Amino acid sequence: MSKGYWVARVDVTDPEKYKTYITANAVAFAKYGARFLVRSGAFEAVEGTARSRNVLIEFPSYQAALDCWNSAEYKAARDCRVGAATADVIVIEGYDGPQPG
């Protein structure tokens, strides 16, 4: 079974309020087995536009990633983000097929 991922690009506009979102999202992330692979590290936008933060979160499955996004726990966290940040988020299924080489 393929893992699931959230890919998020975020511009934080109110850092203090955004801290509330970070605290609130921990409940949903723990429940659905989320694991941060990238969390606002150094980056270089080599093509296209970028936001100030990039986040990649891994879930045990694509369904778990969707379930987390649609959960009451994450909706409560997402509500905390309103007015604190602008985000682009996609939920994507991982790839388990053959690799080059």
Residue ranges of model-derived segments:
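Short S/T/G/P-rich N-terminal loop/turn motif that feeds into the first structured element of a domain
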Residues: 1-53, 60-70, 93-101
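C-terminal structural segments of small proteins and small subunits
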Residues: 66, 74-90
